[in-house]
A protein has these predicted regions:
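Glycine-rich phosphate/adenosyl-contacting loop at the front of the ribokinase-like
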Residues: 1-80, 87-91
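Conserved phosphate-binding/catalytic region of the ribokinase-like
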Residues: 1-9, 14, 28-34, 177-180, ...
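A short, aliphatic-rich alpha-helical micro-motif
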Residues: 3, 148-151, 206-208, 238
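Alpha-helix C-terminal capping segments
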Residues: 67-76, 120-122, 289-292
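Hydrophobic beta-strand scaffold residues
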Residues: 77, 103, 185-186, 244
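A glycine-rich helix N-cap at a beta->alpha junction
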Residues: 95-112
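Conserved phosphate-binding/catalytic loop of the ribokinase/pfkB sugar-kinase fold
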Residues: 104-108, 119-165
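Conserved beta-alpha-beta core of the PfkB/ribokinase-like small-molecule kinase fold
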Residues: 154-235, 242, 251-253
């Protein structure tokens, strides 16, 4: 059997977050509605990017954030995600590998630039987001490296991969390889709208044993089981046969299996700045804990510690090593 070399392989949309401070007039000139979030096409994405002036670039994407979190804990993550052979693709590659993530997905050589979320910040702090998916939607089964999947304790994938047909095929191919090598497969539901699009297919992944572990928040799990009652959704998750890691914001987290339910409290945070990466970093802590044979309680506690750290600042990546924070809270990392 292949030796486990990675705590987790994270697979998802490789998106570069590009931040720029702009004046109100800039939004007016570009016909943008302040505070809005929208998807844009290639020509507009390139034109807007070229007008942004001085920018700060941070590699993003949900699964990428989780991989970076595992690395920050001192773990060994790998990542699959598609970028182009362009300036932002260079930044993404450098950034991911620089944080300690093994990342070597072949780059797209033609026609679609690297995905980017261009975030324009006006003097009042309001964010106007313009997202171009570009190259990340071209992830396909040919990008799934069997040796890496076989060497990962768990393969963790975004629900967003279900949108492009080739990415869906890649998801299923990676899951099949993982199980062939007696590894685990996890999905994060991504958002409630994604759940609404693919509800039957996602529940099928659970009931058919394609997915062993599901990550969801309260909105997503209610959407999955079409109920407004959390306890009803929890009961349905318990009957799915898979493990569910459920984040509940200020109420902490719950781990649900057919045999047991574990509840852990959230860490106290007095000044919440940005909730963007909370779920991604919870997953990082939990997956890290599972790879090191922590109890479900301890793995969930570490997940909550990681989530509490990232919501204290802007952005979805750790600002300080999570390894130190975990050690301060009594974890051996």
């Amino acid at each position: 059997m292949t030796e486990i070399r990675f705590d987790a392989l994270c697979i998802g949309n490789a998106i570069c977050d590009v931040f720029a401070h702009v004046e109100e007039d800039f939004l007016l000139q570009e016909g943008l509605v302040k505070g809005s979030m929208r998807l844009i096409e290639t020509d507009e994405a390139v034109a807007l990017f070229n007008k942004m002036g001085q920018t700060v670039r941070i590699s993003g994407g949900s699964a990428g954030n989780t991989a970076a979190g595992i690395a920050s804990l001192g773990g060994r993550p790998a990542y699959f995600g598609k970028v182009a052979e362009d300036e932002l693709g260079d930044s993404y590659y450098h950034d991911m590998n620089g944080t300690g993530v093994y990342y070597n997905t072949p780059r797209l050589r033609e026609w679609k630039p690297t995905a980017r979320s261009m975030i324009l910040i006006t003097p009042d702090g309001e964010r106007t987001m313009n997202t171009y998916l570009g190259a990340c939607t071209e992830f396909s089964p040919s990008d799934v490296d069997e040796d890496v999947v076989a060497a990962a304790a768990v393969t963790y994938m975004e629900g967003y991969l279900w949108d492009p047909e080739e990415a869906k095929k890649a998801f299923l191919a990676a899951a099949e390889i993982a199980h062939k090598h007696d590894r685990k497969v996890a999905i994060t539901l991504s958002d409630s709208f994604c759940v609404d699009r693919y509800r039957d297919e996602f529940t099928g992944l659970l009931s058919d044993g394609v997915v062993d572990l599901m990550f969801a928040n309260e909105h997503e799990i209610k959407a999955l089981y079409q109920t407004g009652v959390l306890d009803t959704a929890i009961s349905a998750a318990r009957e799915s046969g898979a493990m569910t890691a459920l984040t509940l914001g200020k109420e902490g987290a719950m781990i649900i299996t057919p045999e047991e339910t574990v509840k852990v409290p959230a860490q106290q945070v007095d000044n919440v700045v940005d909730l963007t990466g909370a779920g991604d970093l919870f997953a990082a802590g939990f997956l890290f804990g599972l790879a090191r044979d922590y109890s479900l309680t301890n793995a969930a506690e570490l997940g909550c510690i990681c989530a509490s750290s990232v919501i204290k600042h802007v952005g979805a990546r750790p600002e300080r090593p999570l390894k130190n924070l975990a050690a301060q809270n009594g974890f051996e990392v």
